[in-house]
Amino acid sequence: MANYYTDNKDLKFHLTHPLMEKIVRLKERNFEENKKFDFAPMDYEDAQDSFDKVLEVVGEICGDIVGPNAEGIDAEGPSVVDGHVIYASGTEININALRKAGLMGMSLPRK
């Protein structure tokens, strides 16, 4: 089982950069959303723990599914049928894996 996150120590290095605390504090609105949403992080350490867990899941999906599908997706490519785009079969598999993991919409606001 490949994991593009845990297998790449450079990613972890960047996430522990001293500026990350300031970035996370800004992104998380100084952790005020924790008062409204029980799943919002309460502090920097909690946020980093959440990021780490999500990235482990994403890294596993990328290592086990997305990466191995890449060459086939490039070879097959998308097509247009009756004015509608049809994804390569590997793209559908990738999207379904991300959906099943609950990762679709991760960048949307909590409310």
Residue ranges and their predicted role:
Residues 1-81, 85:
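Extended, charge-enriched "interface" segments that sit outside catalytic cores
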Residues 59-60, 90-111:
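Internal helix-loop-helix
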